[in-house]
């Protein structure tokens, strides 16, 4: 009695364990099918509603591992709502589990060809018989549905007696282990098969694309299964897995599927989220790129309301968009850049675009119609001279303060074209006597035009009145060009004019060698071209003046560029003023001694010019006998 009772208890425990394995096999099979046929939550169907499954896998973290995931050593992502559609706990293991994968398509209005274009087989045969049309609640739209897959999981217990008689030969523990291992292999085969069928292509397209499609996949677990007709079943293909033998029967798994060769995307519409319209290089990011032939308008064009502020564009609250002119001016660094135009460089800007402090003095000359100078398209210096004078945008004027003498400073207005000829330089000089004019002229021009090196910006022409061309400074702002309204043009200072009676012998010593640069910007060269000019300068420093200056009412002006930034090419040209100069007489012996010294200086100068500078102008002197 005891042995039979123990045998019955063992059989009951083995049967309970087998039923639990079968129950978990059904649940895991359903989970695998729903996981590969239910779109993620991020995907949307044609109605815009979100799907129910989450893409997070249950095996991603240890806290999310459920007891069911340990079965068959296969963890899947969660599909709670899909699993709720089939209450597997209330179903009997003797009932088959049927899962239909339905493709729901909503064709376009007036378009009935969606069915034919969406599903085709490899041979090109169209499937129309499997579609069912039903109307919505409003009755205005129809939905075409077609079952593209049908999975059947069932437990066949017709050979229970045979299995019981043959199973007595084996131990119960070995039978359960073999059953569990075979069920694990079958589930892994199912996991691979669901990803090889054509419906998985639709599933991936719905999940990976950011589109709202006119079709969707809907897995269903019907309580009442409608069998296929013979025609429908003939159009579908069947695949059956190898059944798993158990102590009470066997587990069977099969699938009916359609051969879908292509899923057309013609019925898809763009997704509703906002597009990035103002990406880099987009016409919407720069409104002027969209309209390259806009007429010239004063001020900045209105920006689009949805445009965002970028680091690569101009601030909408401070400046206008970049210029689209064919001849841009990259050297202007002011924050109020105007919208340039090829034919509008001479037009004045709108009064609202001009700052208050510069509205009166800056733009009338810059946009004057008489100036035919256009800025170069590159920041490099222009290779041609300015045809009509010097524009105010070329170089900043130089402030020439007077030296710290007791007399007042005298400022001489510049000439129209900055002529450096002898007549232009002598124009502001007061009328002298017949005997005094010759000495003054010789004193002014005996040093010559080459006793100091001119800056690179000064280019004397072949005519008697050379003009000066300047290179633009790429780092100069608009405000630097209009600092001093009294000096609109640069001046050129001659070294012999900045000395007086008391400071002539030591003026160059205090200032340094004549060959050293006069200012910190390095505008003047550091060395002369030959030694003859240097010897001439040293002789001029030591030579006493022909006549003594008895009046100190007027002093020459000294050019100072300490306040100017380094690297800016600025040239000063100034003429001496002799309104208060009175000349005194000297002895004849002193005059003859100076005459001999000036002859020697003349010979040195002519010799140096003939060897080093053949194009220099011959210097004449009234003392040439």
Curated annotation (Swiss-Prot):
InterPro entries given in the database record: ATG13 (IPR040182), Atg13_N (IPR018731), HORMA_dom_sf (IPR036570)
GO cellular component: Atg1/ULK1 kinase complex; autophagosome; cytoplasmic vesicle
Subcellular localization: Cytoplasmic vesicle, Autophagosome
Region (Disordered): 322-388, 452-527, 544-564
Amino acid composition bias (Basic and acidic residues), ranges on this chain: 498-518
Disruption phenotype: No visible phenotype under normal growth conditions. The double mutant plants atg13a-1 and atg13b-2, or atg13a-2 and atg13b-2 are hypersensitive to nitrogen or carbon starvation and show early senescence.
Bias-annotated ranges (Low complexity): 322-332, 455-477
Pfam family, one: ATG13
Keywords: Autophagy, Cytoplasmic vesicle, Protein transport, Transport
Keyword Protease: no
Gene Ontology biological process terms, A to Z: autophagosome assembly; protein transport
Signal peptide bounds: none
Role of this protein: Involved in autophagy in a nutritional condition dependent manner. The ATG1-ATG13 protein kinase complex regulates downstream events required for autophagosome enclosure and/or vacuolar delivery. Becomes a target of autophagy under nutrient starvation. Connects autophagy to plant nutritional status.
UniProt similarity note: Belongs to the ATG13 family. Plant subfamily.
Protein name: Autophagy-related protein 13b
Gene: ATG13B
